[in-house]
Amino acid sequence: MAEAVGHQNSTEHLRKVYGELGMVHGVVMGNRTLETGRHCYPEDLFHYCVGLDSLVLDRGRSIPEDLPDQVEEHLKRPSCCGVKLYPGYNRLWLTDPVYDPIYRLAERYDKPVAVHTGLTAYARAHLKYSHPLALDEAAADHPRTRFVMCHFGNPFLQEAAAVLGKNPNVCADLSGLLEGRVELDRYFEEQAGYAGLLKSWLASTCAWDRILYGTDWPIVNLGEYIGFIQRLAPERHWEAVFFENANRVYGLGL
């Protein structure tokens, strides 16, 4: 997959590309195990969010009794900067009681809960669980827990903007809005309607201090995606979107 977008799936390659593009750090998402020993990343390059995906929760059919304890072991680690939830794939509402102790732990350790919102990668997942309005309920009920609305709820842009605007404890990342290689001038010409809506709804939130750059790598070329986000965010907000917000929200200490 990485090769299809002009990259190599290796730490050495990413370190080189990060240096060339001026990227200083990354947050690894989508981890498929709760074993702490399987989460060892170069500390100068990555933090990670421990992921509760369908392989961990078996689409909501099998919840480990010690799930909160396992998650807490990760949150205790300096290299773990949050939790990642996949409600559409697990077919669990974000208000399901199984998540309550996770939200409390995130609050206690002052680390965010990132949530996959919007479209899913395969048809068997259920969109109703990953709709931005599902996140609104969890954010409203847990006002002292920080949430990151991954993918800005795409394509539910209007609802995503409403959730971001309403809830001060919600941030949004702009990862995964493209897939594959892209020629930006052509893209913004052919997809002018969608791009215009996306840009307008982002601007409508007046929340550039809570909007984060992200990629969903390896589905995009990093250099091209930086250019894509630069066309969506006003230049005066680039430092916040590309660095300051993620550094603050995920507590990276950079």
Task: Give the ranges of each region predicted by the language model.
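Acidic-and-aromatic substrate-binding clefts and catalytic sites of carbohydrate-active enzymes
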Residues: E3-N9, G26-T36, L55-D66, N90-P97, ...
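Mid-to-C-terminal alpha-helical segments outside catalytic/metal-binding sites
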Residues: M1-H25, P78, S200, S204-L212, ...
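Catalytic pocket-lining loop regions of alpha/beta-barrel enzymes
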Residues: H47, T95-L212
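N-terminal cationic-hydrophobic initiation segments that often serve targeting/anchoring roles
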Residues: Y18, R38-C40, L75, A139, ...
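Generic structural signal for well-ordered alpha-helices
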Residues: T11-R15, L34-R38, P68-E72, Y99, ...
